[in-house]
Regions:
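Membrane-interfacial, low-structure loops and terminal tails that flank and connect transmembrane helices
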Residues: 1-12, 81-91, 166-174
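Loop-to-transmembrane helix junctions at the membrane interface
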Residues: 72-103
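Hydrophobic cores of alpha-helical transmembrane segments in multi-pass inner/ER membrane proteins
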Residues: 60-69, 143-156
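Cytosolic juxtamembrane helix and N-cap/initiation of the first transmembrane helix
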Residues: 2-28
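Hydrophobic alpha-helical membrane-insertion segments
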Residues: 23-27, 96-113
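Membrane interfacial helix motifs at helix-loop boundaries and amphipathic/re-entrant anchors
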Residues: 31-58, 113-142
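Core segments of alpha-helical transmembrane spans in multipass integral membrane proteins
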Residues: 52-76
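Cytosolic juxtamembrane helix at the C-terminal end of the final transmembrane segment
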Residues: 73-83, 150-174
């Protein structure tokens, strides 16, 4: 069984969930990079520099946010790395990690609900793909994103349970 890099008290399932998050976001990012590179992955190519910057920024930001999930199972999620000015070496208050993680998961659940509604109600203008091969590639790259919200949720809950005192009392500053 492969070794997953995580703190010793992190349950294996939580470490696997946290490590899976950057992997489930990667295919969609690669699809967007292919789109910007001009590969025939969509019906319409990216036409302007502004569109290219937007698509690439979306890719970088989504992957960076996905990588932050690793903080829920790594030492830097409990103690701020020393190289960070002013905060280095301080303990991370558990709720300072859990609240943004659960807010992000909630936003992702909402986003997928909205996308599902738009698709089911046929509200989207035009089609993203021209050919069946493009559609299969698009689905293969974007369907893994459906796992992001549940994986982030269970990772955040495991982090909270691990960092919460036995009496269950936890404040934002603890």
């Amino acid at each position: 069984m492969p070794r997953i890099n995580a703190l010793p008290d992190v349950p294996r399932w939580a470490a696997l969930a946290a490590h899976a998050v950057p992997l489930v976001t990667l295919p969609s990012g690669l699809w967007r990079i292919a789109l910007v590179a001009g590969l025939p992955v969509a019906a319409e190519p990216v036409r302007t520099v502004g569109e290219s910057l937007y698509v690439l920024s979306l890719t970088v930001v989504s992957e960076a946010l996905a990588l932050l999930t690793l903080g829920l199972v790594q030492p830097w999620g409990e103690t701020v790395p020393r190289w960070i000015p002013l905060l280095g070496g301080r303990n991370v208050p558990p709720l300072a990690a859990v609240i943004p993680a659960l807010a992000g998961a909630t936003a992702l659940f909402g986003l997928w609900g909205w996308v599902g509604y738009v698709m089911a109600a046929n509200l989207a203008a035009g089609s993203v793909t021209d050919t069946p091969a493009q559609l299969v590639l698009l689905l293969a790259c974007y369907l893994p994103l459906l796992a992001w919200a549940p994986l982030l949720t269970v990772s955040a809950i495991a982090y909270y349970r691990r960092r919460t005192p036995a009496n269950g009392m936890l404040t934002f500053m603890s």
